[in-house]
Amino acid sequence: MDSQLSKNDVQQMLRIASGATLGFAISKALDWPNPIFFTLYPILLLGLVAVLNGHIIRQFLAATIFPAAAVLVVYGLFGSHPLLITPLIAITFAFLFWQMSKGTLYLFGAFSLVGLSLQLHFASYSSDGIDIYALVISNIGAILLALIIAFALHIVFPDEEPRTPLPKAAKDKASIRHEVILCTTVATLSFAVFQTFDLVDSISAQAASVLILFPLCWKGATLSGWQRALGTLIGCNLALLAQLILLNYSDTLFFASFSLWILVFFISRQHV
């Protein structure tokens, strides 16, 4: 990896750190449920793509509707029937990975997969008092807020140099089919594991099991999984260090948000 940061890299790092912090601070200040949605989605939107245009916005908006419909209709009707819900979710995953593999609607598939996986994880604990409807509304609100934040930050921290569009790799039908089968199998196994065991506090692991599949190949997923494991180790230790430094002030929103901004800005260096 090139150690030299470009001006655009620094601007993107500022957008990622500020987006995560704004989403976190707003959700906490207004006491909104599921703050993980409000913190994660700005990171995804500002981290996966370095630009913001109509095609990206349409995909992101579509990713608010698809997971909500899947959770309310598919899981709402068949969630209590494991032998029915598992193949239905597998078909849903296959459709989304197919969109990603084709490339044109990659972001729609990626955003939908993350939102769907998180909501399915929480929805499986509806008997423990988690309201599915409030969960879906919270997810939609987080996506819309992430768009607003992204708009604002692209104005405040715009690119300083023109970006060269990435070349599109041509894929044959066999390659697409292989990627869809591989990723769908892994995602469905992850879904089954998190539905079977009591892992209500393991939402980050659920999200990670989907995020590592974004390269759409075994080698890429393996490398991504290793990097994510290292990132989790580093991130958790940095968070503990921040808690140790803040001590009794860790419950103060300003200090918690400021420490989050510093840590995300530091870690985003490894992403851009």
Model-derived segments and spans:
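Alpha-helical transmembrane segments and their membrane-interface boundaries
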Residues: 1-112, 116, 120-262, 266-272
